[in-house]
A protein has these predicted regions:
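Secondary-structure transition motifs
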Residues: 1-123, 159, 183-192, 205, ...
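Short beta-strand micro-motifs enriched in acidic
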Residues: 39-42, 61, 127-132, 156-160, ...
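Extended terminal
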Residues: 44, 90, 156, 246-251, ...
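Extracytoplasmic/secreted envelope proteins and their assembly/folding machinery
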Residues: 50, 71, 175, 392, ...
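Transmembrane beta-barrel strands of outer-membrane/channel proteins
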Residues: 53, 168-170, 218-220, 260, ...
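Short beta-strand segments that buttress and anchor functional surface loops
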Residues: 139-146, 155, 353-361, 370
Length: 573
């Protein structure tokens, strides 16, 4: 049979494709036309100058059970041998193929409600299309997203080598349609946010699995997560990832720098010691079914991607913190958080350095600097933390819980060194309290029973400062280990030693190095205060204004009685 078509045109309109058992029409096409058509049946060739699809829409849906609707819909009932198809098939060539003003609805019903994005105004061109493939095909793509955002891409497609090389730019893509993803495991709401990325993508489909390499940048902006009460829980102004390299064949992800601008978080410790993040977690409807006893062994997991981030920089961060598990609820605000972390890596033995600084409440300052193994912090951590000019009155919640007293006045500066090696903690805390006084009593079942006013008076120097050194140690793998408890135990030990041996504390505080301040010695039978003893009460009065000293008398009979007899004998002689 010999038949030819020379420079023909074809046109179809109002195409609708739907399964017999569905009312919805998943595929529509307003018009399809082919111009410059040339067909030669004897040579089995089909040529066209232009193939153009205009208008219409396709719905790509993943059902609740995970099946792709279009794949199921177009699955062939009988698969013909591909080798036979090649023998019998035609060679097809199209100079230019176009898609104009098309739309795609992406729906994922494995989430409830479904995740949905509507791609609109899809315009695409591809040149030099040939089947079987013979050469590379330049292509161009642009589209808008109804929910917000746009995508542009340009590159080449090589069907013979099964490869793609393209550059793309995705801008201002709305993240709020992903709210059902967040709601699957939490009660939180993704209130706002948009994302973007740009760069180059190279795909080599001949490798197994296909190798994908991406170089470029990505960003998230105006992200906000809200609680069920519509309160802001966390978010950020902008997160930018610069100089990204993702290579699936080399199993690596490398980022030169991550810039985080105006991050915010709200952390609340509840009365039962859970956090607000625990409260927002959803309880699974039912536990996952156990695998059958005769199930085949699972395939070994693929090697994880190696992740490296050279630098993370934070600016203008803030956090609201509250602890409701205390006798008096406590809250503070951390502001102007800034700093950086360098050398982050998923390698277990890698160490990262960090340096951060932020304001606490109105006039306080907090700093942290050191190094850590980010994916194994219990193996190695060495962090120095410093607090300066922190008002103590808001800390009454903690003193009320542990000491049964509010704080009337005072400020604190604290230097802490945290060192962890193989889960063993060695901590060193140096604390300076300025003008520190306790206020009214508060009922607390965990309060210590110590004369705290005496301890404070004994510890306060002539300039109104209390200087404490609090070394701590422990095994953080111990389930009963609590760093706060260890520090409080160290403070309690200091206070106990002070009130049970006050003059030893005074001797250490004032430089005598002994307990001699506790004794004022008189010659037996004499009321004259010796010059060597006059310094002791003077020292205490000048350096410890808060103390009231009560002097008691102790008489040593073995020394006094002979002396009194001698004095009496002198008077009668």
């Amino acid at each position: 049979l010999q038949a030819t078509v020379d420079n023909g045109d074809l046109k179809f309109s109002n195409i609708r494709v739907t399964p017999f058992d569905e009312k919805n029409i998943p595929v529509t096409l307003e018009s399809a036309k082919v111009t410059g058509l040339m067909v030669n049946l004897q040579q089995k060739t089909i040529r066209a100058g232009l193939a153009k699809l205009s208008g219409g829409r396709v719905t790509a849906r993943r059902d609740a059970d995970g099946d792709l609707h279009l794949v199921t819909m177009f699955a062939p009932r009988k698969v013909q041998d591909t080798k036979e198809l090649r023998k019998e098939g035609f060679s097809i060539a199209v100079d230019r193929a176009e898609i104009v003003r098309y739309g795609v609805a992406l729906i994922d019903q494995t989430f409830q409600p479904a995740v949905s994005y509507d791609l609109e105004q899809i315009n695409a061109t591809i040149s030099k299309v040939a089947i079987p493939a013979k050469n590379t095909n330049p292509f161009d793509l642009s589209l808008q997203i109804k929910q917000g955002g746009s995508v542009k891409a340009k590159g080449t497609l090589d069907l013979l080598r099964e490869s793609v090389d393209m550059r793309f730019d995705a801008a201002n893509i709305a993240l709020t349609p992903l709210d059902p993803v967040l709601k699957r495991d939490t009660t939180l709401t993704l209130a706002s946010g948009k994302a973007g990325a740009s760069g180059r993508v190279i795909v080599d489909g001949k490798k197994t699995p296909p190798a994908i390499r991406y170089t470029g940048a990505a960003a998230i902006a105006d992200l906000e997560v809200q609680t069920p009460a519509k309160e802001k829980l966390g978010g950020l102004k902008r997160l930018a990832l610069n100089n990204i390299v993702v290579d699936t064949s080399e199993k690596k992800v490398a980022v030169a720098q991550i810039d985080v601008s105006q991050p915010y978080a709200k952390l609340v410790i509840n009365k039962d010691k859970t956090t607000n993040f625990d409260v927002f977690k959803r309880t699974p409807a039912k536990p996952a079914a156990a695998p059958p006893a005769n199930a085949a062994p699972a395939e070994p997991a693929a090697a994880p991607m190696a992740i490296t981030v050279e630098r993370v920089r934070v600016e203008s961060g803030a956090m609201d913190f509250a602890d409701l598990g205390l006798v008096l609820p406590f809250a503070t605000f951390i502001k102007d958080l800034q700093g950086s972390a360098n050398g982050l890596s998923s390698s277990p033995d890698s160490r990262a350095s960090l340096k951060f600084e932020g304001g606490v409440a109105d006039y306080g300052l907090a700093r942290a600097e050191g190094s850590i193994q980010p994916f194994a912090p219990k193996k190695f951590t060495d962090i120095a933390v410093a607090f300066r000019n922190i008002e103590l009155v808001p800390m009454s919640a903690y003193t009320a819980t542990f000491a049964g007293r509010k704080i009337a006045s005072g400020k604190v500066s604290l230097d802490s060194q945290y060192k962890i090696e193989n889960s063993k903690l060695l901590g060193d805390n140096k604390m300076v309290l300025d003008k520190f006084t306790l206020g009214e009593r508060v009922e607390s079942p965990t309060a210590v029973n110590l004369p705290l006013d005496l301890a404070i008076a004994l510890l306060t120097d002539s300039s109104g400062k209390i200087d404490l050194a609090l070394p701590v140690a422990g095994d953080i793998d111990n389930p009963e280990f609590s760093y706060g408890h260890v520090v409080w135990q160290a403070i309690r030990t200091v206070l106990t030693r002070v009130v049970t041996a006050p003059f030893r504390a005074l001797g250490a505080l004032f430089g005598s190095g002994s307990e001699t301040l506790g004794d004022i010695v008189f010659d037996p039978g004499s009321s004259r205060l010796l010059p060597t003893e006059q310094e002791k009460p003077l020292t205490i009065s000048l350096t410890a204004d808060g103390l009231v000293m009560v002097q008691t008398t102790e008489v040593k009979d073995e020394e006094l009685i002979p002396k009194l007899k001698a004095i009496a004998a002198e008077r009668t002689s």
